[in-house]
């Protein structure tokens, strides 16, 4: 195994930036080799101990890259939820994978605070294919992970006074400040010398992604529940006593999303599989192929496991070394892994996030693979097609879009208590 020419060039450039500025960002598109570029940079600066913060799903591939290259430094790979298990902070370099996951604003996340407190003085390598998927305002907290940030403002609000066009928005019955309109041209000169970018096109990728939408007729009960829920905002099972309540616009969106793929999470936290039509369709349609399946909700995984039995795994290493299918949740499986062994990528459901849409569909892309086929499994007359049309245009499927798509007035869900009392008297028999 050896580095590609552009990885050598990028790691050499990154080495100089890291030495001078203590922060280097490799903002490279998926499958361009961010991991190896970062590891080589650590080798170039003669690091002795390196901490690599990533998701559990990416552990094995990072370890494999490290082992293949016989690097001299000691590598510790960990997920951010387990940082408390590390004793001491004596690392020479900290690599933060998918750094956009720490870029929420206006307030930093708990994980952001943890990393800054413990490792803020250590040189950092930051990796992402989509550093600012929502707003250029995300740049502040990305760089503020380090105490060597080019932004000298003590907090986001002070930074926003200089670089953000703050807009007041009405949210429900309250007015809030919207900090998403950052003026990039005003601060780009401060950060551009920290950033190295590379695209799949520059790397020589010529992969064609073919997307096919396959529609599945769901069971009558699914359509009946959705219809009643949109009408009354509550559905109570006459057989189990379980209740589905959608007394806010967000809840109605979430419940509709769950139901059209055949599952529901009840108010008491329990989950129920109502309709396995999608899973049965996949079982019949893709028999004989090696597939990777993306799902959204825990109940969907349970349905897939019930349907496919021992044919299904959630372990990437087992998938790569057997004829089993793999099921991955969008949130944990969209970043940092490769599904190059899969014949097809199957999207059991679709997420509201545009970032998730674009990252997950690239999981099969490799330099020598010329064509990928992705199958979207949508319910007929369901919500999925509406989500798809939104996220493919790089926009999140927000609650306001949902309410507009379904012609629902915002104040209807907010003033639904009386509706719930009346509707609870009319029960629908769930499976």
Task: Locate predicted features.
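Conserved Helicase C-terminal RecA-like lobe
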Residues: 1-2, 19-24, 29-33, 37-46, ...
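A conserved SF2-helicase RecA2
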Residues: 352-358, 365-431
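Walker B catalytic acidic pair
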Residues: 97-99
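Inter-Walker segment of RecA-like/P-loop motor cores
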Residues: 55, 69-85
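Conserved P-loop NTPase motor "coupling/switch" region that bridges the ATPase
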Residues: 93, 111-200, 369
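Conserved Walker A/P-loop ATP-binding site and its immediately adjacent core
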Residues: 30-41, 45-67, 133-138, 297-298
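SF2 helicase motor core recognition
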Residues: 35, 83-88, 128-136, 299-303, ...
